[in-house]
Each structure stands twice: as structure tokens, then as C-alpha cells.
A protein has these predicted regions:
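Terminal leader/tail segments of proteins
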Residues: 1-215
């Protein structure tokens, strides 16, 4: 069975103890009813649009009762526990996924804007910090000494911060620079640029020369 929320309106301002929202409830592609929560800590309510919607909601309730319970892991405040699934919890879960997706998109849009101006590091989809340049990073890389400047900045200022889940988040820095700075693959997000196109990188050039002399 397919249970969906559409035309979701989520209010951050009205969300106090619970998430305040309104949405259309669709079951198997049919607009069956509506769902809402006023944000004051009460239950999420849902109700049918018409007689057909009432029957679809009844079927959805039965369907959700047979789904696995929701498992909540232990943390420093409470022990692990589980809650039996029902349609209300299913609707709440759909809402949380919607909010998370929206927040992730907002986060990534801000991140992408920041990485145009500098070197960005942090926990993917959660948090980040940045070291910015006076010029856009593409202009820095175009300068003859730019690649070496970026490499040295990563090595001296970013690499020491790459712990506790932090990674280099730039996708616009050539991977050859990142590797020359000493980063392992698990310490950075895969960039869209593989090799340097502008300027020179001393470490890379020296490695190439050494390989050439060893043949």
C-alpha cells in the first residue's frame, strides 16, 4: 500500500512541542483525506475527504498495524524502546522525511555557494566550516601559484580538522591536489574534477619527475 503526504505546509514558527503542518493524505494514488498537527504537543490528526477516503483510511490503518514497530535506540537520556506502528506514526514519519529532505537541500545549496569562495570541511549534510579566499576558488586555481596555495592550505589548516566524521567537502578542487595534500579517500567527498588543469603543483610535479627518473 502506498501512503503519501502531498501539498505539505510546515510551519517552523508554529512548531513548539511537535511539528506544525497541514497536508493532503493520499492512499494508493487517491486523495483520501487530510492530516494536520497544530504543533502544541498533541497527536497528529487525520480525517477522510469523503466516503471513499474513509474506506481507504480504514485499509491504511489495518496495513500500518501489521508493519514492524518503530525502534528508538538508547541515548544518554533514555533506554532503547519501541513503539507499535499505526497510521498516525506512519504519517509523522513521512513528514519527518519531508522536513529532513528539505533541510538537506537548503544545507547543500548554502554549502555549494560557500565552496565557490574557499575550502569547506565538515560533516556531510549536517554542519561545515570554511576557509575563504579573496577571489573565487576557480580564479585562485587559475593562478600559476594557486594550486600550490590551495594544497598547502588543505595540508596545514584543513587536514588537522578532519576527525570525528569531518571531511573535506569541496567537489570543485581537483582530486590530484587533495591527494597531494595527504588526504585519504575516506577524508574527502569525491570531487567532480580529477586532475589539475591550471598552474603547477610542486608535490605532483616532483612525483612525476621521480617516476620518470626511476624508469
Amino acid at each position: 500500500m502506498k501512503i503519501e503526504l502531498k501539498s505539505i505546509y510546515h510551519s517552523v514558527q508554529l512548531s513548539e512541542e511537535t511539528e506544525a503542518f497541514t497536508a493532503n493524505l493520499y492512499i494508493n494514488g487517491v486523495h483520501a483525506g487530510y492530516a494536520k498537527n497544530e504543533g502544541h504537543g498533541g497527536n497528529t490528526d487525520y480525517y477522510a475527504k469523503d466516503e471513499k477516503g474513509r474506506e481507504l483510511i480504514r485499509q491504511a490503518e489495518e496495513y500500518c498495524k501489521n508493519l514492524p514497530p518503530i525502534e528508538y535506540p538508547a541515548d544518554k537520556y533514555m533506554d532503547a524502546f519501541s513503539v507499535n506502528m499505526d497510521l498516525e506514526h506512519y504519517i509523522d514519519d513521512q513528514l519527518y522525511k519531508y522536513i529532513e529532505k528539505k533541510e538537506t537541500a537548503k544545507f547543500n545549496a548554502k554549502l555549494n555557494k560557500t565552496m565557490l569562495k574557499g575550502i569547506v570541511y565538515g560533516v556531510p549534510d549536517q554542519s561545515y566550516g570554511a576557509i575563504t579566499f579573496n577571489l573565487p576558488i576557480v580564479n585562485v586555481l587559475a593562478h600559476p601559484k594557486g594550486p600550490q596555495t590551495v594544497l598547502q592550505t588543505i595540508k596545514d589548516k584543513i587536514l588537522p580538522k578532519l576527525k570525528e566524521g569531518n571531511k573535506l567537502l569541496n567537489t570543485n578542487i581537483p582530486e590530484s591536489i587533495i591527494k597531494s595534500a595527504g588526504l585519504k579517500e575516506e577524508q574527502y567527498v569525491k570531487p567532480t574534477i580529477q586532475n589539475i588543469r591550471y598552474g603547477t603543483i610542486t608535490d605532483v610535479d616532483n612525483n612525476k619527475n621521480n617516476r620518470g627518473r626511476s624508469r
